[in-house]
Amino acid sequence: MEHTTLSRGRTDTSAESDAPSLAVAAPELTDALLARMDVPGPRYTSYPTADRFVEAFTAEEYIQALDQRRTGAAAMALPLSLYVHIPFCESLCYYCACNKIATKDRGRADVYLDYLEKEIALVRAEFSTRPTVSQLHLGGGTPTFLSNAQLERLLSMLKSAFAFKTDAECSVEIDPRRLNPGALALMASQGFNRMSIGVQDLDPDVQKAVNRIQPPEVT
């Protein structure tokens, strides 16, 4: 998804910076370079990229990776960054290649949270103390598909298992068409200080073509 990012309490001062330039000269566009780069690849929206999530990576290897962090003094000193995927959408945007489930049944989110709670418990059990978290991002899908009660439950689960830093960056993807009354106040009270608002295109014809009707007044 493409987003317009709004950050509370953050100012871009890059234009006024006295820091030395880190610009790198553009490579020469040779036929050999174009031939090497003109190949398909995964959508680079996250790391590791989607093609790295394969069945060959077993549960045992995942536990081993957690164990390496648990026993490594240097790794334990570094805070975690958490990503929680909320896959539900009331309708599908035709351009989207994210993992999603189209439904209007809010009850499905309760079942999803049940399983997510079990996964959080499994991860927490690998650490002797609550791991420190410096970043949290809720993505989707549509995180604002969750009711306020479901969102509170999710955050309670996370904060019970992890120790969030007081200055943690907590961000959430918001669909302004799917925003419950009081949701913004709830998220602010829970420490969220950054939100990404989906604005794919303001042209009504394009919105119709991609099945995402979002008038400017809604945005």
Residue ranges and their predicted role:
Residues K100-T129, V133-T219:
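Conserved non-cysteine loop/helix-boundary elements of the Radical SAM core domain that shape
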Residues A74-M76, H85-F88, T129:
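Short glycine/proline-enriched loop/turn "hinge" motifs that connect secondary-structure elements
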Residues V84-K100:
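Local cysteine-cluster metal-coordination motifs and their immediate loop/turn environment
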Residues L34, G41-Y44, A50, H85, ...:
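Generic secondary-structure boundary/loop-capping signal
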Residues L80-S81, Q135:
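Structural motif
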Residues M1-L80:
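Flexible, acidic/Gly-rich N-terminal and inter-domain linker regions that tether
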Residues S81-Y83, S171:
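Short aromatic/hydrophobic contact patches that present stacked aromatics
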